[in-house]
Regions:
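Class I SAM-dependent methyltransferase Rossmann-like catalytic core
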Residues: 15-62
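Conserved class I S-adenosyl-L-methionine
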Residues: 65-74
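Conserved SAM-binding motif I beta-strand of class I
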Residues: 90-95
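Conserved SAM/SAH-binding beta-strand->alpha-helix loop
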Residues: 97-99
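A short, conserved alpha-helix within the catalytic core of class I
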Residues: 150-162
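Conserved beta-strand signature within the Rossmann-like core of class I S-adenosyl-L-methionine
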Residues: 165-180
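Substrate-binding/catalytic lobe of Class I Rossmann-like enzymes that use SAM or dcSAM, i.e.
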Residues: 185-267, 271, 275-283
Length: 310
């Protein structure tokens, strides 16, 4: 579905919800990069430190000269660590935000002149065929940031299976998965003191105004982050601070004070839940690295034979 279709459908249902992938226009991508630098947002710095520490072991496991395929590349900061470790022949970053993707890819190409960089603008949340330029290469998927946690369990399994199909037989996947931890730590990471995450969430409404001829009053909404214990996830919502009516894509909507639009989930995993999810998605975990606090996992998995994948 298009941005327009998802917005109209999401605002019409109860409870209201808009898929998180629409956060990432240029402004949203830049705001998310700012989030990754916040002191409260532990996943980025923790995962980067794990990768630095695991570098030699990772290179021994996967070898060199392969094609690194990164799903949702963003600014490719952690990719630089990975490229230094495994020295790939090709780097294929995939991202939905085209301008942001091309700028980030150009920076990587400038820094690593011996690596062929092929930016690929696509929504990796859907099945896709990789460019022919990497058809004959050994493929190493990279899916950092615990982005897998943004999906419902069934959707996460579908995505992992799609990745396995895209990467092919003999592929490896390096995936970051955030662990269950203290609720206060989790809530601070998704509701920072500076309000950057709030701006990121509210940018979704600003995007509706920019792209769908909307007139959503941004000051009528506030960012809300909650921990859903039963579902083991952080939820982000846009909550109406007062009764409000607005237009989006030619349709009129009204929301009562306290009503929310659910914009994102971020599931957190126990070690066993992470392994079960990967296996259900057609991947067999072969190695795991964690930080000293046990907050975050980086897992190396290999494609399971088709008969072994559920």
């Amino acid at each position: 579905m298009s941005f327009r279709d998802d917005v109209l459908a999401g605002l019409a249902v109860r409870p209201r919800a808009i898929p998180a992938r629409w956060f990432y226009d240029r402004q949203g991508s830049e705001l998310f990069e700012a989030i990754t630098r916040l002191p409260e947002y532990y996943p980025t710095c923790t995962e980067a430190a794990i990768l630095e520490k695991a570098c030699a072991e990772l290179a021994d496991e996967v070898g060199r000269g392969l094609a690194v395929v990164e799903f949702g590349s963003g600014s490719s900061t952690k990719t630089r660590v990975l490229i230094r470790c495994v020295e790939p022949a090709t780097y294929l970053p995939i991202d939905i935000s085209g301008d942001f993707l091309r700028e980030a890819a150009a920076e990587v190409a400038s820094e690593f002149s011996g690596v062929q960089v092929i930016p690929f603008e696509a929504d990796f949340m859907r099945p896709l065929a990789l460019p022919k330029a990497v058809a004959g290469s050994r493929k190493f998927g990279f899916f950092p940031g615990s982005t897998i946690g943004n999906l419902e369990p069934a959707g996460a399994v579908d995505l992992l299976r799609a990745m396995r199909g895209s990467l092919g037989e003999g592929a490896r996947l390096l995936i970051g998965m955030d662990r269950v931890k203290d609720q206060d730590v989790l809530l601070a990471a998704y509701d920072d003191a500076e309000g950057v995450t709030a701006a990121f969430n509210l940018n979704l409404l600003a995007r509706i105004n920019r792209e769908l001829e909307g007139d959503v009053p941004l000051d009528a909404f506030r960012h809300r982050a909650v921990w859903n214990e039963g579902a083991s996830r952080i939820e982000m919502h846009l909550e109406a601070a007062r009764d409000v009516a607005f237009t989006a894509a030619g349709e009129r909507f009204a929301m009562a004070a306290g009503e929310t639009v659910h914009t994102e989930n971020s599931h957190k995993y126990t070690p066993e839940a992470a392994r079960l999810l990967l296996r259900a998605g057609g991947w067999e975990p072969v190695r795991e690295w964690i930080d000293e606090r046990g907050w975050f996992s980086v897992i190396l998995a290999e494609a399971r034979p088709p008969a072994a994948a559920p």
